[in-house]
Amino acid sequence: MNYTQEMNLVSKSGYCMPFEEKKGEVNLTLGYGKQIHPVTQEEFFHHGVDFATHRYILTAVADGVVSGIGSTPTHGLYQVIRYGKYEVTYAHLANALAPFGARVRAGSVVSISGDLLHIEVKYDGEEINPMEFLAMLYGNLLAMRQQGHPD
């Protein structure tokens, strides 16, 4: 996907990363794209990224609306939050705290992760690499700090 300025996420309430690292770091256990399955050793396309988490508090990254909550055999409990043209899915959750239809702001607690957090991101219906989305969020946070806004 070619990224443009219009793809920058705009949020009146500011920006927040989806979780705070408890000990200063969190391990990425599975990246986006072609991967080797850790159990079967077969190649497959991973549509998101996985982090090793254990009951992490997950927060809204910007102004948004909870647009989906459900459960599948593959991803367990999941929650979808729409931020403008972005749609972010948190999966393998222990609990979804923000109900369907809830309006959220940056930093609002929305769910609790399980031992693993799977994140998928779509922009205008097209799947994108979640790490690029997280990098954009981090860039927005840095820009706000430089302008003197609190986190």
Model segments located where?
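Surface-exposed, glycine-biased beta-strand/turn segments
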Residues: M1-L77, R105-A106, A143-R145, H149-D151
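Conserved, short, structured surface segments that act as functional micro-motifs
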Residues: L28, L77-R82, F100-D151
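Zn2+-dependent peptidoglycan hydrolase active-site motif and core
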Residues: F44-H47, A60-L97, D115-V121
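Short acidic/polar mixed-charge low-complexity motifs
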Residues: Y56, Y86-E87, E126
